[in-house]
Amino acid sequence: MRLFSQFFGKKSDNSNHKLSKVSAKDLNITTSETPEKFMHLKDEIVAFLIDKLQDINFLEREIFARSQKLKNPKEPNQVQPGETELWDEYAARYKELLTPIAFNPLAGSSNSFGNPAKYDYLSNPDTEIFFIMKSSNRAVVETRYKYGIGVVQKHQFVLKKEAENWKIESKKYGFENETTWYKDAI
């Protein structure tokens, strides 16, 4: 019976365990399309982006765990007490995270959370990161990671410099072996 429960029983809730942030220095970053004169900006820009994406990821994981605790198994399709307030809190905190780092923080802002969280792939050692910079005020960071069963998904972040700070101008997603990029929310 224990073997049956191990495979088909209730899954343990591991969404509460604390994750540590991945350092940009620990990631595999390809810079082959970046001229040498911009290489000194790689660590600054990639570290900025990865740090902010992980902040968003931790928020999503926290809200998801709290949402699961509100669920009532007897009424799985009903809005539970506290759920509306949780969504409001998520939206406010999400906006608070994005406002200082994005040119248009409300454009296509996230309206969902889940498990795994959107940027969990950053802690996967197989994730590839490409740093592309051809002008001093604009950089592109692309990530490639396995999603699901063998599907390789890509994210593309375009960052621009405003005064002395880098900000995310846009985010797109795509799939391996495709040249098309689709607009996406940060």
Describe each region flagged by the PLM.
Residues 1-11:
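Short acidic, low-complexity intrinsically disordered linear motifs used
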Residues 2, 40-44, 176-184:
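Secondary-structure junction/capping motif
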Residues 5-6, 21, 51:
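Generic detector of low-complexity/intrinsically disordered segments
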Residues 10-27:
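N-terminal intrinsically disordered, low-complexity tails
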Residues 24-110:
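Core segments of small alpha/beta cavity-forming domains
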Residues 83-149:
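Surface-exposed, charged secondary-structure patches
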Residues 132-156, 162, 170-186:
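Low-complexity, intrinsically disordered terminal/linker segments enriched in charged
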